[in-house]
Amino acid sequence: MLNELEIINEAKNQTGLENFGNPLFVEGFKTLINSINKEADLNEVGVEAQKHRLIGILANILRIESAFIENPEILNEEIKSPVVIVGLPRTGSTMTHRLLASDPNHTAMLWWEGRYPAMLENEQRGNPVDRMEMGKAEVEAVMQASPDALTIHPWDYKGADEEILLLEHTFFLSLIHI
C-alpha cells in the first residue's frame, strides 16, 4: 500500500527541499493515494511504479517552488501568441500538435520536459541531459511493458506532447494513467 507521509518524505529527501508552496494539491494527492490503495488492485510492481511516479511528481513540485522563490522574475515571463490545441482523445490532436511543433518558429513542450519540468539539483542551466535520459528510460519502460501503447499514442521522449504531463502535478486531473 502507498503511504502518503513516506512519499512526501522521500520527495523531500531526494531534493533536500521542504517547501511545497501552495497546498492546493494536497487534497487531490490524498484522494489519489486512497483511490490507488482501495480501488486500483495493483500488484507489487504496480504499487512501486506508482510510488516512484508520485515521489517524482512531488519532487518536481518542490523544485518548481524553489525555482520561483530563487527567481521570482519567472512570473513576469510573457507568452506571446500561444497556440492552443483542443481535442478529445484518439482524434489526432497529438499529431496536429506535433505537426505545428515541427515549424522552427514554434516552441512546444517535449515529453521529457512535461514529465520532468524542473531542473535537478546538480543540473547546469541549458544542459538537461539527466532529465532527458530519465524521460527516455521511462518511455522505453512503457514500451517494454506495453508495446501496444504505441497504437494509441506516439510515445517519443523528444516529441512534443500534451499538457497532461504538467497537469498531473496539480492532482486536479479527471484522468490518471495507472
Per-segment meaning from a language model:
Residues 176-178:
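Conserved small/polar residues in nucleotide/adenosyl-binding loops
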Residues 159, 171-174:
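Eukaryotic endomembrane system proteins
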Residues 85-101:
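Glycine-rich phosphate-binding P-loop
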Residues 103-111:
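Post-Walker A helix-loop "phosphate-sensing" segment adjacent to the P-loop in P-loop NTPases
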Residues 45-88:
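Long amphipathic N-terminal alpha/beta scaffold segment
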Residues 117-165:
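P-loop NTPase motor core
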Residues 1-52, 56, 64:
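Long, basic/Gly/Ser/Thr-rich N-terminal segments
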